[in-house]
A protein has these predicted regions:
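Iron-sulfur cluster-binding electron-transfer modules in prokaryotic oxidoreductases
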Residues: 1-173
């Protein structure tokens, strides 16, 4: 069980390609993102968590398009969001989503290194959309996205906090 959607997606989808047919290692078939595991395997109907804050959910590119943690806006599919399903079990929480909810934050692994100015601008735009929801926190299952946006917000003194979704699900335990 991996705590980051982009890491889980890499191992699940790209590790077999790197192994070039050598399948002694079955990691790609066994790895799951923590949200995927909790939602699809554990299937909790209640949690003891208490988090009396307004949160805006960040749907990461890898989480949406590779792990199917939520439905992508560009497809005509029924809407679902495993992250929000789990957060709804938390007492006291107010859940929001930004405009253009599944648009990239600009991190994208090597993209942020190869195109740092574009990456920063995309992150700034995404943070502004999250802040426009009135949220106190931005949350999601992808540590790299959260770290990218948190770094930008800190440099620009933005009054928003960042927290991994699992920290909320475990709040008050």
């Amino acid at each position: 069980v991996a705590p980051s959607a982009s890491c889980a997606a890499f191992v699940k989808l790209y590790h077999p390609r790197l192994a070039k047919g050598n399948h002694e290692c079955l990691t790609s078939k066994k790895i799951m993102d923590v949200v995927e595991f909790l939602h699809d395997v554990v299937k909790p109907t209640s949690l003891k968590a208490h988090f009396p804050h307004i949160v805006s959910v960040h749907n990461s590119c890898h989480g949406v398009r590779e792990l199917h943690l939520s439905s992508p806006s560009e497809r005509q599919e029924p809407l679902f969001n495993k992250i929000i399903d789990l957060l709804k079990l938390v007492d006291g929480i107010t859940i929001r989503e930004p405009e253009r909810k599944d648009e990239c934050c600009g991190f994208g692994g090597m993209f942020s290194i190869e195109e740092p100015d574009v990456s920063k601008r995309m992150g700034e735009d995404k943070i502004e959309r999250h802040m426009a929801t009135g949220a106190e926190y931005i949350t999601g299952p992808d540590s790299s996205c959260l770290m990218h946006m948190q770094g930008i917000a800190k440099k620009e003194n933005k009054p928003i906090k960042f927290i991994h979704v699992v920290e909320i699900l475990a709040a008050g335990l």
